[in-house]
Amino acid sequence: MKKHDLIPFFTVLLSLVLGIVVIALLGKNPFLAYYNLLQGSGLAPKASYAGHKGMITDFTSFLNALTPMLLASLSVLIALKAGLFNIGVSGQMLAAAFVATVLVGYSELPAVLAKPLVILIGLAVGALVGGLVGYLRHRFNINEVVSTIMCNYIVQFVASFFINVLFVDPVSRQSKNIGAASRLTLVDTVVGDYKMDIPLGILVAAAAVAATVFLLGKTTLGFEIKAVGSSSRAAEYAGIRVGRTRVLAMMLSGGAAGLAGVTYYLGYFCSMQPRVLASTGYDAIAVALLGNSSPIGIIFSSFLITVISKGSTYMSSTAGVQAEMASALTGIILLISACGAYVRERLDRWKENR
């Protein structure tokens, strides 16, 4: 491990220390607040509350939130490795989930067929949308930031139109709930005194991380993606087909985003809200950067950001620290991680000039 690979760990540590200082200045107990974050995420014991709810319930809810965040971060990471910036993860998530919901979610297929179909459709639709962005970059030199933002709007309003016209629930004004057989859950039942809702998507996410590690570290395509991301001109001189590699990278990125979409809308939730894009796709950009653009690194960064997000409500009610403090803490972490990226770049330049 290189020395500057430890920079993300130090930036997170420094951010948590700054969080302690800020919470202390507010007159609250920072250590209790951090412990409450863990309790709210189901990572530390606490008393049961309400009906069938307690630590186990909170932990399975945490897994449901972690899964799409991890997959969305993988999507951003793959694009970054190719020197591309996929800001359209939220749109790709919605496109994949909408198609999967219409084709499978409202059907009467048995779970043994419905769940694999949902995953495959999510992967395929996400890859198609991502591949379109890559093709526009290759064929017409349209910057992927512009095209992904436009795709976000197109997907958002097309999906909203069909939801409002054909699939709206008259009470909730969201899309109709999908069938239980199509939900990406392994276990959804009450065991003893606790409700268990374990996501199938966590296995999908683990497989996706392993596949990404293998792709980037052991395959020719992975080498080509990293070469194009480092220097497209040098890669072209080396005989690598830059356009083809970018299209494939965006297809892989979109596929991961599609998986994030189906695990979010057909796992974490059971419906889609018209004209609303999931913030997960945007948060994933910061998570991927915080994870040092490494498949293993984003496991830890996704874990950290999800803990802060899921535990904030319990922290607010127990420690008296406003839930907005969790968002501020996330912002501090990302700001200092950006400074860490600058330090890493300066270290690399210093070594080159020695």
Please report, for each region that a protein language model flagged, where it lies by residue.
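Cytosolic-side transmembrane-helix boundaries in multi-pass membrane proteins
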Residues: 1-14, 20-24, 31, 230, ...
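Hydrophobic core segments of alpha-helical transmembrane domains in multi-pass membrane transport
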Residues: 8-24, 69-76, 97-103, 123-128, ...
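Single transmembrane alpha-helix segments in multi-pass membrane proteins
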Residues: 22-28, 32, 43-107, 119, ...
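Helix-loop-helix "hairpin" substructures at the membrane interface of multi-pass membrane proteins
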Residues: 193-270, 295-296
